[in-house]
């Protein structure tokens, strides 16, 4: 299944976003940014399984006033930034 990563500005923001999504029925797991993904050193992401969940999460986060920075899709050979 496809995996999507939505970047967060801090661990606190990632945790808040995950909690709000959970309340809306969208499961997201908070994790560290994979090495070399953003070029900004350490960071946190929400991991979601499947494009449908990623699109739903992106819309809900924007609706709730969050401004997630980037979305990446995981491929066998790495990650690429995508638009939802």
Each language-model region and where it sits:
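C-terminal structural segments of small proteins and small subunits
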Residues: 50-84
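Amphipathic, hydrophobic secondary-structure cores in small proteins
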Residues: 2-5, 9-22, 26-56
